[in-house]
Amino acid sequence: MAKDTGKTVKVRLVRGLRGTQSRHRLSVHALGLNKINDVRELKDSPQVRGLINTVHYLVKVED
């Protein structure tokens, strides 16, 4: 098994999803975030960065 040497990024949901667009709610769930203050450590990839850019006003990125 190869070692995982890729960088990771921590994402925290800091705002609730009430009143947001359904597309943005789906993006937050795709990041694995469900409740306020949920934190996920994700592999830093263009796909993840795109999801973060979509919901930048709902999440906080902790490198």
Curated annotation (Swiss-Prot):
A Pfam family cross-referenced in the UniProt record is Ribosomal_L30
Molecular function, one GO term: structural constituent of ribosome
> Any keyword Manganese?
no
Keywords in alphabetical order: Ribonucleoprotein, Ribosomal protein
Assembly and binders: Part of the 50S ribosomal subunit.
Task: Name the GO cellular-component terms.
Answer: cytosolic large ribosomal subunit
Protein name per the record: Large ribosomal subunit protein uL30
Coiled-coil intervals in this record?
Answer: none
Listed CDD domains: Ribosomal_L30_like
* Annotated GO biological process: translation
What family is this protein classified in?
Belongs to the universal ribosomal protein uL30 family.
* Lineage of producing organism: Bacteria, Pseudomonadati, Pseudomonadota, Gammaproteobacteria, Lysobacterales
